Amino acid sequence: MKKTRDNPCDKIDCGKPKNTKGVSLVKKHIFEDIILQNALNFTEEVVEIFGDLLNKGMNITELVARIKELTDKLGRGAIEAIIEELDRIIKEDKRRKEKWVVERKDKKRLTTVLGDIEYERTYYKSKEDGRYTYLVDDALEIGRHDRIEKGVKIKLVENAIEESYERSSKKACPEELSKQTVLNAIREIGEVEVKREIKEKKEVRGLYIEADEDHVPLQDGRDETPRLVYIHEGREEKNGRNVLKNVYYKAYVGEKPEDIWIDVANYIEDNYKEEKIEKIYIAGDGAPWIKEGLKWILKSRFVLDRYHLNKYVLKATSKEPKYRDKIWRAINEGDKEGVKKVFDELIKAAEEEREKEKIKEAKKYILNNWEGIKIYSEDEDVIGCSAEGHISHVFSARLSRNPLGWSREGLKLMAKLRVFSKNGGDLREVEWGKKKNINAGSYKLTKKQIKEAVRRVKTSTNEKINNITVLNIGKVTPIYRVLRALKYAQVI
């Protein structure tokens, strides 16, 4: 629907300003009139809502929705007026006239967190190199082909980190956006990572690295295994809970194991004094890609995740639970031969071949990971592994619960975004996209211009408030009270 603005003089009696060279001051300073008219309209509509509340009744949710709709509308009008006023200031500037020639005026529609705005701005041609641009858009960092402002994109991506693209698109702004718009915003931001500011490398005796992977369906019917690695300094108590100390998460999709561990090794080198580290524990389920880390991380030892250890003990003893305590006793004592003996007894006791194979598989898993098991009884600094819970919270909660499957690109970007969020990242601090605006910096207001513009707007607005008929009549109404407050408190 095409937006129109009321003529401020239709509703506000601004008095009869003196004419200078046949030019109406109302036309010259339309910005102030629009802002003042919007304030009046807002006041009238708030009073109307209050009347509906008293006469018809409404609950707090309905009241909030009505007021939000109203404030969004007020905000859109203010933004449109401000942009067009800035365009006028640039157009009248002597410096601009020396370098840029006016070509024409064009309209632009932009989706914001307040909804769609539409404004007119001036198109210019450079006298120096012949390039064309909209100087007001350059000043506000609005790209030539931008249809959605950055604030909306940030909300789209922030919502998409936790929810589906469809839900995200419905929450970012009042306008209807598509799922593709969400994906485009995610593509624009790219692979993000929180870069911690390092003033001085830390000294620690021990470091803990935990790793696991998720299994995520793709749109082509295949599966992908995004991998999660996180580095921390042990556990500490906060608000009655054990939490990981100085934890940092990393996500990998499609990378080779050696590339993963080179990246982890670089993180350790960048953040810690390696010569002071005595021990590094790499914990996980024993997958080859996790054990690959032992080749790349100095002073590292493997620790088997007790979740998976328990899983295989239960698997082996499902038909003979009486052997469970025997296996755990041998494990806790670091008695490898004792573990073998109990498993041999289990295999003999199994009646079905399928049950025997299941027990043999569990035995093989435990013995192949024995170094990561016996370390529990040898090293008091071992704290176990919480990777299974983290993979569920960081990845599975969003990645493996998409019934339609992911594109490979979308999965990688979302995995990176999930750990970006876990690491405390702020999308407002990220440089979006790789495209550079060649006209950036084409025009900047001087301090003198800014000061003069603010002074003029304040003076002109106060004059218009003084000339409003409703104030001069003196009849006490809600509009009268608001305008008196504006007049004497000089809010505007």
Curated annotation (Swiss-Prot):
Pfam hit, one: UPF0236
InterPro entries per record: UPF0236
Entry similarity comment: Belongs to the UPF0236 family.
Protein name: UPF0236 protein TTE0402
Organism of origin: Caldanaerobacter subterraneus subsp. tengcongensis (strain DSM 15242 / JCM 11007 / NBRC 100824 / MB4) (Thermoanaerobacter tengcongensis)
